[in-house]
From Swiss-Prot:
GO MF term (any one): calcium ion binding
Domain DDHD positions: 390-594
Source species taxonomy: Eukaryota, Metazoa, Chordata, Craniata, Vertebrata
Species per Swiss-Prot/TrEMBL record: Mus musculus (Mouse)
Family, as annotated: Belongs to the PtdIns transfer protein family. PI transfer class IIA subfamily.
Protein's name in the database: Membrane-associated phosphatidylinositol transfer protein 3
Length: 974
């Protein structure tokens, strides 16, 4: 690694340590796009010149103006005059280059210059990440279905993304936007053809056997071999550019300069990969095109791709679309590369067809010889074919169950000159998600390095247990260190590689290989040192051809029950699961928000041990703990706390394992974190406590660190296994008005002895939201034990109840009604709250009467009885009539207390662990392989969502003491 530079001599710095060599290399070889990851929300044109003058020297400004003049003259002297739009693009690109040199701070810390209001208005783009979802369906889609089915998948994905962001990534709310790019169903003709070829196609009675006989892996291979495939790629590029252009014109995209990520499903991933590769070609390059390609560094948390920028501009071997392949056509030297044409980046598939026809002619020469020679004779015409290119820079590329590995393996077989390095797409990182049982998916890493077939793919952490990641390293350097015996240079000679990649790719420029090695060393201080055990040449050979700095293959959780499903049903099932998977969404958010997570870990007052994914776990303090917690799941809970503005703030949590609190976590560390600024999403570490013999911790917030009026999320994280308990701390001013709801008495329309999911009374959610809209604080109270908190909160979240404070009994109590009365009385006396209205059943009348509430403020759901007729208001006609009465009359009014307390209007998030919502059937997609029903054209308002759902989920009860509902998600509890 000491040899670098264009001449192959010693690198600057000689034998200096690796980090000094990187600093010297950056200072010598830095390009204009080195600081592309800095924020670019600045004005262009005249304002850009003024800002540039204040931040840069006037000589550079003169050079830019002269350069623009030279470009204009050069274009005027050529055969074709440069249009005004092209010249304006060149001017804007030069301005961008000068502005990048200003080295603006990272996102979130940009300073406002003296430009004031004008500059601020031009920096106000709220979208930081644009996710373009290329949806082409699975390999069995016929393409004749309803287009709204694809839109339904995107809607599902968007809703899951929003819920996960609200629960664990609140800083990303409003800054990530999803756009849908429909892709043609390129496998439909291949599926029709193969279906007619199977031995059972003549027998309609054996339809199931006929479908199972379809070779699913052959469908994408046939699809990409079709001459129409090139048109499909061009269509995708055109649609993506159109949608991106419309986005820039919209209110969400004006001034956008963030990162653009691509998400491709089974078919869309194939088209997206080739579209990225075509976009990396040299055709149509402008002087600013090198910065375009270099823009992928804006989303990379390491400088690897920044250093690649110059190589991206100068090397034409970054993708399969512009690779020198050995010709198989007769009358040509097979060792001589094909002559490069001016626009060969847009004619790769035409050359591939030529090669493929020549390959077939060796087998069927009498039939295909003329066809194989015809394209070769018409080669000059092929150079005129143009597929276009993306108008944006691709940062991260996510694949959902794509057979890209099979396609690239076939291309490597037909065109032996292609290897993994030359097929590298122009993006900073590729992530390939798949289920191990998915017949459509395949791995990519063994194509880039054959020895990786012995390395298992990265297991995506389960969102239910590790919403912020489980701490496993995704860096390639760490994987090379962990499996270093596999990648030693001597050991790799024994097995025949899938790709005949040399020890150092001769096609790549020398400086590009050097920068790849240096960037690998500087990507992570630990990983660079950990890979020292691997031979430097072996490590550089692998990293030089890798598609980023992290692992590529990621395996999702796959239930064993899927092995019993018919093979033909699996593509539809797995394809639907990606859009519903919280595991996938959380993983994507962790990758695209790396700048935010880095700033969180570096901020003062934060606990890096509890939040850093690089070191999330510690050893248990007691050796017995690991044995006690084997084969049991966490059932932690922390009580919601209400405190007066000038009173003590005491946080209480209990850490138990097992559904019935069979095991208590005793004598172990628990980190206490609070989100002091909920809008920022940053967790502040308060302290670390040790659990007592009953698994409890009680923490009194010190007076200097007490929080002001507001609602603050609280998280208590177990150091040993990173399980956590979520709650809220609410600090109220004196005289805060509240509305109390008894969960079982006022919301549940059915009583289940076996504990299955209770029905919700129609209109209950609307009444609660009515009081919330008026500014009242919502108090949910129940006599159930606190061990059921996760189940109850999940039930409230499933039915879209508004956010509020929830209170349970402390364990199993003999008289829960008495506990309710004591608790509410303490709130009124110690926190000085005022109860404006109280809802419940007839059992709760005594509780509310003891508190001194008049009959006009007690609302009981159910039939009127003479015994209690004078003590309460009966809602015999249901919540709908009651809500109409509240809105029509003046029985409900806005709260009168201090306006300093502004409550967040919303519903319960996903901090309630979704595994408590699981029920009997985890695979809600049917085997009929139908897409989900599209969303209604006029969706119901949010209030209408409170109507009870179908009773189809109430057929089979769960064990006792469980409130559960099976959401339409694919995942199941491991």
């Amino acid at each position: 690694m000491a040899k670098a530079g264009s001449a192959g001599g010693p690198s600057p710095g000689g034998g200096a340590p690796w980090h000094l060599r990187n600093v010297l290399s950056d200072s010598v070889e830095s390009s204009d796009d080195e600081f592309f990851d800095a924020r670019e929300e600045v004005a262009e044109g005249k304002n850009a010149i003024l800002i540039g003058m204040s931040q840069w020297s006037s000589n550079d400004l003169v050079e830019q103006i002269e350069t623009i003049g030279k470009l204009d003259e050069r274009q005027g002297d050529g055969a074709t005059a440069c249009t005004s739009s092209i010249l304006q693009e060149k001017q804007r690109e030069l301005y961008r280059v000068s502005l990048r040199r200003q080295r603006f701070p990272a996102q979130g810390s940009i300073e406002i210059h003296e430009d004031g209001e004008e500059g601020c208005s031009q920096r106000s783009c709220k979208t930081h990440v644009l996710l373009l979802v290329l949806h082409g369906g699975n390999v069995l889609d016929t393409g004749s279905g309803d287009p709204s089915c694809k839109a339904a998948d995107i809607h599902t994905f968007s809703s899951v993304l929003e819920k996960v962001m609200r629960a664990h990534f609140p800083a990303a709310l409003g800054h990530i936007l999803i756009k849908f790019v429909p892709c043609p169903a390129i496998c439909s003709e291949a599926f029709s053809l193969v279906s007619n070829l199977n031995p059972y196609s003549h027998d309609e009675g054996c339809l199931g056997t006929s479908q199972d006989h379809v070779p699913l892996a052959a469908l994408p291979l046939l699809a990409i071999s079709s001459p129409q495939y090139q048109d499909a790629v061009a269509t995708v590029i055109e649609r993506a550019n159109h949608i991106y252009g419309e986005f820039l014109k919209s209110s969400d995209g004006i001034g956008f300069n963030g990162q653009v990520c691509l998400i491709g499903d089974c078919v869309g991933g194939l088209l997206a990969f080739d579209a990225i590769c075509y976009s990396a070609g040299p055709s149509g390059d402008s002087p600013g095109s090198s910065s375009r390609k270099g823009s992928i560094s804006s989303t990379q948390d390491t400088p690897v791709v920044v250093e690649e920028d110059c190589s991206l501009a100068s090397s034409k071997r970054l993708s399969k679309s512009n690779v020198d392949v050995s010709s198989g056509v007769e009358d040509e030297d097979p060792k001589r590369p094909l002559p490069r044409k001016q626009s060969d980046s847009s004619t790769y598939d035409c050359e591939a067809i030529t090669q493929h026809h020549a390959f077939l002619s060796s087998i069927h020469s009498s039939v295909l010889k003329d066809e194989a020679e015809a394209p070769a004779a018409g080669t000059p015409q092929l150079s005129e074919v143009s597929l276009g290119r993306f108008d944006f820079d691709v940062s991260d590329f996510f694949l959902f169950g794509s057979p890209l590995g099979l396609v690239l393996a076939m291309r490597r077989t037909v065109l032996p000159g292609i290897d993994g390095f030359q097929m590298r797409p122009a993006c900073s990182q590729v992530y390939s998600f798949f289920h191990c049982a998915d017949p459509s998916a395949s791995r990519l890493e063994p194509l880039l390095e054959p020895k990786f077939h012995l390395v298992p793919p990265v297991s995506v952490p389960r969102y239910q247990r590790f919403p912020l990641g489980d701490g496993q390293s995704l860096l390639l350097a760490d994987a090379l260190h962990t499996h270093s015996p596999l990648f030693l240079e001597g050991s790799s000679r024994g097995s025949p590689p899938l790709l005949d990649a040399p020890a150092s790719p001769p096609q790549a420029p020398r400086f590009q290989r050097t920068e790849r090695r240096l960037s690998k060393g500087s990507s992570h201080s630990d990983s660079s040192e950990s890979s020292d055990s691997l031979a430097p040449m072996g490590a550089s050979r692998i990293t030089a051809k890798w598609w980023g700095t992290k692992r590529i293959d990621y395996a999702l959780y796959c239930p064993d029950v899927l092995t019993a499903f018919p093979t033909v049903a699996l593509p539809h099932l797995f394809h639907a699961s990606y859009w519903e998977s919280t595991d996938v969404v959380a993983f994507i958010l962790r990758q695209v928000m790396r700048y935010e997570s880095a700033s969180v870990k570096e901020s003062t007052g934060l606990d890096p041990t509890a939040l850093s994914p690089a070191n999330p776990r510690e050893k248990w303090l007691r050796k017995r703990t690991q044995v006690k917690l084997r084969n049991v799941t966490a059932n932690h809970r922390a009580n919601d706390v209400i405190a007066a503005e000038d009173g003590p703030q005491v946080l209480v949590g209990r850490f138990m394992y097992g559904p019935l609190d069979m095991v208590a976590l005793t004598g172990e560390k628990v980190d206490i974190l609070v989100m002091t600024e909920p809008s920022s999403g940053r967790w502040v570490h308060l302290d670390t406590e040790i659990t007592n013999n009953s698994g409890r911790i009680t923490y009194n917030v010190p007076r200097p660190r007490r929080l002001g009026v507001g609602v603050y999320p609280v998280k208590m994280v177990v150091r040993g296994d990173q399980t956590c308990a979520m709650s809220y701390l609410t600090v109220l001013p004196r005289g805060m008005e509240c509305v109390v709801f008894s969960i079982d008495g006022s919301f549940a329309a059915s009583v289940s002895i076996m504990g299955s999911d209770p029905k919700v009374r129609p209109g209950a959610v609307d009444v609660v939201r009515h009081w919330q809209d008026l500014g009242y604080m919502i108090l949910y109270i129940t006599g159930r034990p606190d061990m059921q908190k996760q189940r109850v909160v999940s039930w409230l979240s499933q039915h879209n109840f508004p956010q509020g404070m929830i209170f349970f009994s402390d364990g199993l109590v003999h008289d829960p009604l008495r506990q309710k009365a004591i608790f509410l009385r303490n709130l009124m006396q110690e926190c000085f709250i005022k109860i404006t209205a109280a809802y419940g059943s007839t059992k709760d009348i005594s509780v509310y009467s003891v508190l001194g509430l008049p009959a006009s403020q007690i609302f009981i759901v159910g039939r009127s009885t003479k015994k209690y007729q004078t003590q309460c208001q009966f809602l015999s006609e249901g919540y709908a009539a009651h809500l109409a009465a509240l809105e029509a009359s003046h029985r409900s009014r806005p709260k009168k207390n201090n306006s300093r307390m502004i409550l967040r209007k919303g519903s319960f998030g996903l901090h309630a662990q979704p595994e408590f919502l699981r029920k009997r059937n985890h695979l809600r997609r049917t085997m009929s392989v139908q897409q989900p029903d599209p969303p209604a054209a006029n969706p119901k308002p949010e209030r209408a969502q409170s109507q009870p759902e179908s009773d189809k989920d109430h057929e089979r009860p769960l064990p006792a003491l469980s409130w559960a509902r099976g959401p339409p998600k694919f995942e199941s509890v491991p």
